[in-house]
Amino acid sequence: MNNLSFLASLLAYTITNPKIGRQILQAKYQSWQDSGYPVFNYAEKKLQLDDIIKALFPESSYLIEDLRKGTDKLQNHVDDFFNKLKNETYPSKKKPYPLEYTLDNKSGLFLYILCKIIKPEKVVETGVAYGLSSMYILQALSENKKGMLYSIDSVFSPWQSKEMIGSAIPSHLCENWRLVFGSSSEKLKET
C-alpha cells in the first residue's frame, strides 16, 4: 500500500469513525515525532537464558529444560496459526499486524518462566496484536492455577479489528484473560 492510498483510506476511515480516526492520526504523529530522536547504540552482552534466570532468581530450583517443555505445545500452536496467515497479505482484515510484531520463542519462554517463578496475581500488558506474549503468560498462569492477565489494546488502523486482537490465543487459555479495549493512556488508570 503506497503512501497516497494509505492516506486516502485513512481520511475516509476518519470521516466515518472520527474518534478512532483521531487516535490513529495521533499515533502516526507520535511515531513521526519519535523518528526525529536519536537512536542510541548500547553495548550488547549476550547471555544465555539459564544464566539470566539464575541471576534473577538464585533460589529457584526450576530447570530451564523442564520449563521449555511447558511451551512446546504453544510453539506448535503458533506455527499452525502463522501457517494459516502465510498466504494473506498485510495489511488486511485477515492479517492486520506485520509479522515483525511477533514474539520470538526465547522471549516467549522468558515471559513464561517469569510468570511460573513469580506466580503473579495480576499482569498488565499494553499492546496485544495477535497475542503471542499473552499466550506464554497465560500458559504459566493456567499452570499456576492463579493469576489474571489484563491486556490493553485498541484498533489503530482501518484494517484492524477488535476480533483479531489476541486471535492467536488458544481458547483454553482465555479463562485467565481480560481484554481491555481502548488506548493504554486512558485504560491503564482503570486497570
Q: What role is predicted for each listed range?
A:
Residues 34, 46, 75, 79, ...:
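Proteins with a high burden of low-complexity, intrinsically disordered sequence enriched in S/T/G/P/A and R
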Residues 41, 52, 60-105, 113-118:
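Class I SAM-dependent transferase core
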Residues 1-61:
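Membrane-proximal basic amphipathic "stem/tether" segments
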Residues 56-60, 64, 184-191:
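Short, intrinsically disordered, charge-balanced linker/junction segments flanking boundaries
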